[in-house]
């Protein structure tokens, strides 16, 4: 039988991946009932996602919500400062979603 897990975390990970839908599909396939997935993104104000000068990807809130909407229920999301680059804080968002 295939192993199922209760908790997944990807904090400061998705910034290294542009198209993240496949990540969410894999996580969903490994979820036990009501499993939680906690992840962060760097905020992108445009559509979908973009590769930044920092060589990291930023994702829009709408892009993420469209991907998770049929696989997970969003329990919480908060705007945060995810890291500091030099003297500048980088805007991000942390999500807590639950498998449906």
Q: Model-predicted segments: where are they?
A:
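Short conserved loop adjoining the S-adenosyl-L-methionine
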Residues: 1-3
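A conserved beta-strand element that flanks and buttresses the S-adenosyl-L-methionine
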Residues: 9
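Hydrophobic adenine-recognition pocket in adenosine-nucleotide-binding enzymes
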Residues: 13
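A short glycine-rich, Lys/Arg-flanked "PGG" loop and its adjoining helix->strand segment in the class I
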Residues: 21-36
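Acidic carboxylate diad motif detector
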Residues: 39-41
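Acceptor-substrate binding/catalytic loop of class I
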Residues: 47-63, 85
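Short alpha-helix
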Residues: 56-77
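Core SAM-dependent methyltransferase catalytic element
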Residues: 81-100
């Amino acid at each position: 039988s295939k192993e199922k897990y209760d908790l997944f975390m990807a904090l400061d990970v998705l910034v290294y991946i542009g198209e993240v839908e496949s990540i969410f599909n894999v996580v969903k396939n490994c979820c036990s009932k009501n499993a939680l997935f906690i992840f962060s993104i760097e905020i992108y104000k445009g559509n979908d996602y973009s590769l930044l000068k920092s060589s990291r990807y930023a994702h829009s809130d709408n892009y993420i919500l469209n991907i998770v909407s049929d696989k997970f229920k969003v329990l919480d999301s908060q705007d945060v400062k995810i890291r500091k680059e030099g003297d500048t804080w980088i805007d991000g968002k942390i999500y807590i979603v639950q498998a449906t």
